[in-house]
């Protein structure tokens, strides 16, 4: 898995949590009653978030 900075990690998880809260499907099985932020963190830990980071070279 790619090593992200803390800023990239925060941006990816925050963006994904917003997507989930707006109705996007969750890409993993989550227990009932979980918040969008917790779901986004679980997705990030499993490496299934469909967001890429492009760094300038």
Swiss-Prot record:
One of its GO terms (biological process) is transcription by RNA polymerase I. It is found in: Cytoplasm. Pfam families: RNA_pol_Rpb6 (PF01192). GO terms for molecular function: DNA binding; DNA-directed RNA polymerase activity. GO terms for cellular component: cytoplasm; DNA-directed RNA polymerase complex. PANTHER family: DNA-DIRECTED RNA POLYMERASE SUBUNIT K, DNA-DIRECTED RNA POLYMERASES I, II, AND III SUBUNIT RPABC2. This is DNA-directed RNA polymerase subunit Rpo6. It comes from Pyrococcus furiosus (strain ATCC 43587 / DSM 3638 / JCM 8422 / Vc1).
């Amino acid at each position: 898995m790619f090593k992200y900075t803390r800023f990239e990690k925060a941006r990816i998880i925050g963006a994904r949590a917003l997507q989930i809260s707006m109705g996007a499907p969750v890409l993993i099985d989550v227990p009932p009653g979980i918040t969008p932020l917790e779901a986004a963190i679980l997705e990030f830990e499993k490496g299934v978030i469909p967001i890429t980071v492009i760094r300038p070279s």
